[in-house]
Amino acid sequence: MASSLAAQLSQIAAKSTNQLDLKAQRLSHSQSLIFDRKVAGTQDFDTVYQICFEGFQELCQLDARFNSFERTIFSEQSKTEDRTQLSAAQNKELDVVLEAFLALVGGRLLLSPAVKAVDWLIRRFRVHEYNTEFTILTFLPYYTTPLFLNLLSILPEDLTPTFKILIPYKKGLLNPPRHPLVHSATTNRAFLAAVNNYVLTVSRQQAHHHALLAFWAGIITEAVAGMLDSSRSGRREVEKQKHEDIILRILPILNDGFALKNVSELVIGCYMVSVVLAQKSSLQDKLLDGLMEAVAGSWTEETLESGLVCLAVLAQQKPETRLPRRALKAILRLDDIVKRLTDISSQYQTSNLLLGVVAGCVDDLTKHKDTARLELLPRVFQTQLLGELETSKAMAMVLHAASNAHRDGTMSLDTQACLADLVQEFNQSEFLQPIFQKTIAESTFDTAAIEHNLQTVIVTAPAPRAVEDVVMGDAEKVVEQDGFSSTLEALVGEKLFKSSFLSAQSIPVFDRLVQAFALAASSEEKTQVFSDLAVLGKSEVSKSPQYLSFFIRVFSGPYPIGTRAMALNIVATFLTSTSNLDLDFQAILPFLLVALADPSERIRREAAAALAAIGGIYKKHKKGENVWGRDTIYGQEKQSKSVQWLPTRDAQKVFERAVLPSLEECIFDPGHISKVLETTLRGASVDPNASELKKPLRLSFFTFLCSHAIQLPLFTPKLGLLGLLNRIDKAGGTTRTKELEPLLKAWRGLSEQEVSDICEKQRVPVSEVESQMVTIVTPKEKDALTLLLSNVSPYSESLRSTFVAAIFARVKDIWARVSEDRQVLAAEQLFDIALGLSDSALVNNCRNLLRSVELPGSVLIEFLEKIPVSLTDMEAVGPAPKRRRTSQSNMIAMTVKDEAEFGKVMEKMTFILELVDSSSPETHPELADGLFQTLAALHHFKSQIQSGMSYLLSLTLGSLLAIVNRSKESAKAQFDTSVIRADLVVDCVRTTESPQVQNAALLLVSGLSVIAPELVLHSVMPIFTFMGSSVLRKDDEYSVSVIDQTIDQVVPALIQSLRNQKRDVVSGTSELLLSFTAAFEHIPSHRRLRLFHALITKLGTQDFLFAVLAMLANRYAMDKDVLVLMTGLVSDASAPVELTVRRVHFYCGDSFLTKLQTYYKYLDLVTDSLKAKPSISQVLLGIGSDDGREPQKVAVDLLRDLAYLFKHSSLKVKMAKAFASEDEEVIGQIRALFSRILEQVLTIGDSVQSMKLVGQANSDVLGALFGTLTLVDFLDTIEVLLQRPSDELRRKVLRLLEGRLRQNPERDGASQIRVLDFLPTLVDIVRSSPDILLKHAAVACIDRIAEKYGKKDPSRVVSAAQVVASEACIGQEDDRIRIMGVLCLASMADVLGQAMIPALPEALSRSLALLEVSLEKGKENSRLHDATFSLFSALFVHIPYMISGPILDQILLLSFKSANAEDCEDDGRQEALRMMARKVDMAATLGAVDRNWQYAVQAGPAAAKETLEVVSLAIEKHPKSATGKNIGVLTSILFKVFDLRREQLALGSKATFEMADIEEIEESVNDVTIKMIYKLNDSTFRPIFTKLQDWAIAGLPKKDTQGSLARLTTFYKFLQVFFGTLQSIVTGYASYIIESVVSILGKASPSDKNTKSLWLATMRLLRSAFEHDQDEFWQSPSHLTQISKPLISQLAHATNSSTAALVIAEAVPTITELAIAADSTDNHKDLNTLLMRFLRPSSGPTGNRVAGGENPHTRLAALKAEQSLTEQLGEEWLALLPEMLPYISELMEDEDENVEREVRKWVKQIENVLGEKLDDMLT
């Protein structure tokens, strides 16, 4: 039993928030995000609030949404909120506000103000304990930061299971990695749910931020993927069930997320989760559709791309391609959906989504109102986003829709036209046609129905293959009749064709024959019948070529493989069967060789059989010379006769040695025959065992083939034969070019139309024929380039553009394979064409060719030599010498006479320089001479025509730069450096405005300074002048690299040159330095430090840093950007800015010494500038020059900048490091240098005493210099300086000390001791010095020391306080020392507390005297006034018990006088009075007020108000017991204040208070009285109340009517506040005043100005009393009867519009509240009876007409009362309606319009309440 009870008690104790558990409270209070536990534990809530509120205010400036929290959790009241004292409901309301703030601040937690603000929630509201989950989730996105670690450290130990993952990291104080968080989200449902709910809550509040949503999206995506992976199971049903559970948990999150469209990152996160669900689980089609619709419905412009990706992924998971309707509509509404899908298709599969779009577009074609959807389809197919299979599916969808359209209705014409165009696109597109044909072939579509529905024709075979068209076109007819028979019948009657079928390109009978042959090709019987046709002349085959030429043309032509193979088969069969004929069939050889190169193996096999047959014939007939088709093969014309035939024996050798041995390989390799011909004609046999063909035979064979290629009219076999021959450059002593040149010339002569017709008929590409024709020219031909160019030059308009393009392509192709001398000739020819015929079509081709081939150096040199010549020729066309004018530079200002000629010259130069630039000039160093000559010519020409010529200069300089940069890589220059013209390059920098030219020239100068410095440096200085005005302004990366390179390479060489000449380097480079400093303002800000840093490094820090600093200071003075740069230059410890003067062992000594030396040289420069004859400053700063500044102004600027550097550079840190080292040598050197610098500053100060501005600037330097010292060193230095006789110096150093102490002085023990040791020195100055200003400075220092260090040893400060309070300080006549002394005493009081008592008597007496002096009329001193009150405030706070009553009386009297003074500020006085009220004993304070109230009234309203505020604050801040003890004096004060109205009215015109002032004071005293009442009990207060009542009602003689009315008015105003504030608690007090109220109601009137205020107070008092009655006080008949009649009788006062308005506004609401309080039917009836008397005339309370209802204003007021009662009481009041109806009827006919209008309103009001009309009741 005991153990159980103990366990329960321990649990209760664990959860207890008992206020007496001080240890737990301290622990809780010390938990903070930003303070250490020890620090936090010592802070009170005022301090914490002040710190945190500052952060909150900064947040409000960032986001106005934070402002609303200023009235709640960041209000002043929040400092006293204690959650342990709040009820559960109040805590719940508080939670809502706190969590709203946390949600909003979450996005800014990495900002310091946000952390401060949140710390208030932790310190005051303990959100980490009461709102743990929300707090953790707010910080969780920052789990890797130290901030999250701080939170972990203050979280409760008993974290819920939701956050169990954080427990080990909390214990170890480690940041959690990402993996455990993901694992927790995967396995811990509560954690994932909490994160999801938090994210949705924050997003709904529009408080989302990137950190949160990025964190959430990553966590939930990985968690869902992990859950799905871990739920996989071997049993499908189990896995399915687990997946469904996961999906059911996730879908609500997605649903809520998709609903928040405006939170784009949240929506994208939902897309990611959707993708994971789709890819890792088998979602049902219905669920996928739902997800897709949700995705499509959620996207905005920001999330559209991600939404489409998600939709594409989801679509890929669907088994069907159809998209849900809503998703489809959303997609089709997008702009340019195809482009959007194209953009994402490179990373994601979009095929299913596109198929879904296609399906949606062709769905319900008959219902389409427009063609918008169908117009999308062509773009879908044209973009080729779909693969071949998907494209086929999409085509099938279109065809299916078109074929079934007639079943669902009728398509519109627009729809029909769109679909027809789309199908034609399928037919005609190169990409789509094969897929379409395959789709048609593999499907069962009703083609006829599609054609009928679309009114178009579907071509089901490729258009170029006419024979297949015949076969396909007649496919259906074959079944019905024999198409071959009908075709054959038309040919049977044809006679033998007159010539060979190879004689012409177009033979009509051939076209008919080939169609018939195609029909017969599948049957041997039909083929035999066809072969026997007379038109073919089979029987005459040995004499005429018709039979074989027909089949040769077929197998060589563009026909189907089957048809061609059958033709070859017939030829082979014929040759085999007629082997006995003594014929030489070499004429067929070229065609069969081409067939051996055919891509089809079947063709190659049949061709091999035919060749074998011919070979068999040759074996049998070796000596015959009867060549078949010798003169007829290509017709009877010269074409046949021009063929170079082989002797039969030679032909037999060719077959036996070259063709027949390789037939087997040729069958399997289409490229083998070309290799065979190539090796054969070159003299190498393919078969090792076969003997080679001899050279004459090779020549004969080659010319035989070439002649056939030339004479053959048909281009299909001609092109094939050329393809074989163009692989052979030479054969048997001749070249391909020589043999086939006639063919090239003939081809050149054809017109474009002829070529087009030929290629169209022969079905060969024009480009391929052109290419093969020009390939005839071989690079091994000596004049190959000349020959090619001769075909296009001279240019003829008849030349085809395709031929010209092919010629130039061939030239480009063989250029590298011809000799350099031929290249030179060709280049010259091309150059002449390129620049000679500006209107020729060859120009661009020539130019492009020259740009694209590799030109040899000799060509480039020759081209460059043309530029000076061209410019010289150009000058020759200038004006006559007599009309020339010379410019200032004695150059001819030439005007160009012929603009066209000038344009040609410019074009020529541009082209040449572009060629050089693109020809890798670095590989041609020999071009340097020509380029410099070109540069000279350009520069000369530029100066004459006043043109920049920037592009040409840029090209020239760029080429030179490339050559120079390559030369820099080698030990010796690769070109003759004597050709260098550095002056021209520098002139380019100086005179051009083009950034490109400037940069190139600068880089060139940099490069030249490396390889030939002696030729460059004498010209280099203008570069820096120019850089300062131009290049340094650039901000692009290239310009920056140019500047860097120029500085790196030119400056060191320049410095070395100056040193070699033994010249002063600083003076010698002054122009350079001036250029850079002048350019400062134009240099991009982020480049400045780096640029100047590099410059100083290259120049040498030791010699140049001071000069650069001085020149910057001289030019820009205190410009902020310049100061930042200067600080950076001297503070960068890691940079070479701080190079050593001489090596020292200590790590920071060398850099520090350099810095001090820089400052020393800088001060030397200042001194030099002030000399009568300046030296170095004249060179660097322009002192003494004509355009130089005044020396004093220069010195001021230099000194001010130096002071800034001392304050803001790293000098102080380096000084401390140096003195902390153990290297005495370093310390000694630094001390010596510092002393020299200090001596310099002091010397300058002594020398410039007559120069005020320079002296001030020097003082600033001195102060800043002292600022670099530690406080101890500083004081040591000051003690020495105080021994100097100069009071000005002594004042200066003390002011510096005060400034140092005012900032953040050192707090270490040594510093504190040293400062306190210095205090006597200051005290001695105050006591003995006659210099008031020096005293003032000393007192200021004492003030700082007391404030900062006084608590360390208060006893040492007391003596200083006594001196300050003495005659030596605040007893002086000078106001400055008085003010400073009083302020110092105030600070000492704050520090010393009761230790201040020894100095107190003198301090108080003198300060009161000083206050009185400061208030003397005409001698007001507001500063002295405020200082004195600040002293009183400090005394009240720290030693209030030492302030006696008389002193308080004096302070109050003087404060009254101050309040009435116009020139005195109020803040200090009011603060002192507040401190008196808070801290001084309440009895003493109230006693002083009571004694001096009359003086406050005499002083005026302001003094009276402030005095009342003292009383109010004293009651508020002191405990209840103090109020009870002092009730007597408090009552006395209140009675005096309550009597103020009477007193002022009694004075009449002599009154000092306006009525507004009186009312304001009465409001204040009412508030004070209420505060007093709160601290009293009823037994204490009730006697006071009765006393107050008696005082108000009977306290004056009866004859003093005005006084009685004044007191009653004040009393009733108090009662209004009394009943209104304390409400039902004091309702019973009304019994005391009923009789008085009734009396007042009988005699006060709103129309009487004397009683109006009293009447108003009475009405409002009664209203407050009635309103808060909860004890049925006014239901009592005795109370009700007593008050009702006098109150309702007040309606009679409404006799005119003004009084009626007042009665309606005041009396009517009071009557209404009385009726509500009466709350019974009987009481209501009595009230109504009284009220209705005023609805009729002659019913006034006095019986006369004026007082009754006779006056319409009275009736109107009564009606308003009835309306108000009806509105407030409703049906309860309308129970009296029967009594009212007669009155209503009469009033509806009242003679007064206003009365009649209001009664009708009342009737409507009644009807609305009752829900029925009153018409029947009123009739």
Curated annotation (Swiss-Prot):
Keyword Repeat among record annotations: yes
Membrane topology value: Multi-pass membrane protein
Keywords of the record: Membrane, Nucleus, Repeat, Ribonucleoprotein, Ribosome biogenesis, rRNA processing, Transmembrane, Transmembrane helix
Principal location: nucleus
GO MF entries: snoRNA binding
Residue ranges crossing the lipid bilayer per the database entry: 945-965, 1001-1021
Taxonomic superkingdom: Eukaryota
HEAT repeat start-end pairs: 583-620, 1045-1082, 1269-1306, 1313-1351, 1775-1812
Any GO BP: positive regulation of transcription by RNA polymerase I
Pfam family, one: U3snoRNP10
InterPro entries noted in UniProt: ARM-like, ARM-type_fold, BP28_C_dom, HEAT, HEAT_type_2, HEAT_Utp10/HEAT1, U3snoRNP10_N, UTP10
Subcellular location: Nucleus, Nucleolus; Membrane
SUPFAM superfamilies per the UniProt record, alphabetical: ARM repeat
Keyword Ion transport: no
Entry GO CC: 90S preribosome; membrane; small-subunit processome; t-UTP complex
PANTHER family, sorted: BAP28, HEAT REPEAT-CONTAINING PROTEIN 1
Primary role: Involved in nucleolar processing of pre-18S ribosomal RNA. Involved in ribosome biosynthesis.
Summary of subunit composition and partner proteins: Component of the ribosomal small subunit (SSU) processome.
Family the entry assigns: Belongs to the HEATR1/UTP10 family.
Protein name: U3 small nucleolar RNA-associated protein 10
Native species: Aspergillus clavatus (strain ATCC 1007 / CBS 513.65 / DSM 816 / NCTC 3887 / NRRL 1 / QM 1276 / 107)
Gene transcribed to yield this protein: utp10
